[in-house]
UniProtKB/Swiss-Prot annotation:
Belongs to the GTP cyclohydrolase I family. QueF type 2 subfamily. The keyword NADP applies. GO terms for biological process: queuosine biosynthetic process; tRNA modification. This is NADPH-dependent 7-cyano-7-deazaguanine reductase. It comes from Ectopseudomonas mendocina (strain ymp). InterPro entries: GTP-CH-I_C/QueF, NADPH_dep_7-cyano-7-deazaG_red, QueF, QueF_N, QueF_type2. Keywords: Cytoplasm, NADP, Oxidoreductase, Queuosine biosynthesis. Substrate binds at residues 83-85, 223-224.
Length: 276
């Protein structure tokens, strides 16, 4: 079956347009991947957001002087569409030789265009380099599981059967790993990520979680669907009172993608990690 991104700019030679071109944005419906995971878009078992951070954002003032900034975009996890990443990059590059009278005008333009393609309101925040530089680099909450001893032989597809828990013990804990890797389903390029699991429920075996995450290593899927698959596999196993799965991926093409899925109200810390 042809992947819905096959008609996107991914994996194709592209002309870089330097003047405002919102038509470059390419939507990819979430519906087919939701169906693959047994989800109904009208009744999702989580709340969430996809945080995109742009480090290659520039435009012109009326004087012709360039401005640079860092852009933060929050796309609702229940939006009908994701925005294909290369088309997002091409769209942002089309702002390079475009005049905007103010930061506010650009922010409103970005929010309008991205919301139209995603199918739900997208929150946009533009930040100065000085503001972001003052925040430094964050660390993930909880215990890192990457030094645990595991044995792994299969990497082609996620293996939820590796996950184990102790149903006789209920715990509340935060775990994280920097060993998440999957591949772009169109180009095959590697996607490197760090992942947080926060939950209250049956005690999860930490080594089994690490082995499970490593089983994604050759799996081909987008960032958002990988996080949703992890959320659902953990939810089925743990039957938790609360569960949050949050991944922060290494940037490509000046963009990083950070999907967040939770049973709880959104409390997202969009703080950059050392690899971002």
């Amino acid at each position: 079956m042809q992947h819905p991104a096959e008609h996107s700019p991914l994996g194709k030679s592209s002309q870089y347009i330097a003047e405002y071109s919102p038509e470059l944005l390419f939507p990819i419906s979430r519906t087919s991947k939701w169906a693959e995971l047994g989800l109904d878009g009208a009744n999702l078992p989580y709340q969430g957001v996809d945080y995109w951070n742009c480090y290659e954002l520039s435009w012109l003032l009326p004087s012709g002087k360039p401005v640079v900034a860092i852009g933060e975009f929050a796309i609702p996890a229940d939006s009908p569409n994701i925005i294909e990443s290369k088309s997002f990059k091409l769209y942002l590059n089309s702002l390079n030789q475009t005049v905007f009278a103010s930061w506010g005008e650009l922010q409103a333009t970005l929010a309008r265009d991205l919301s139209a393609v995603a199918g739900k309101p997208v929150a946009v925040r533009l930040r100065s380099l000085t503001e972001v530089a003052g925040e430094g680099v964050a660390t993930l909450p909880g215990q890192c599981i990457d030094e645990l001893e595991i044995s792994v032989t299969q990497y082609a597809h996620p293996q939820p059967e590796l996950l184990r828990c102790d149903a006789s013990r209920v715990v509340e804990e935060s775990l994280h790993s920097h060993l998440l890797k999957s591949n772009c389903p169109v180009t095959g390029q590697p996607d490197w990520g760090s992942l947080v699991v926060q939950y209250r429920g049956a005690a999860l075996d930490h080594a089994s979680l690490l082995a499970y995450l490593v089983s994604f290593r050759q799996h081909a899927d987008f960032h958002e669907q990988c996080v949703e698959r992890i959320f659902l596999d953990l939810q089925r196993l743990l039957q938790p009172q609360s569960l949050t799965v949050y991944a922060r991926y290494v940037r490509r093409g000046g963009l990083d993608i950070n999907p967040y899925r939770s049973t709880e109200a959104l409390r997202v810390d969009n703080a950059r990690l050392v690899r971002q």
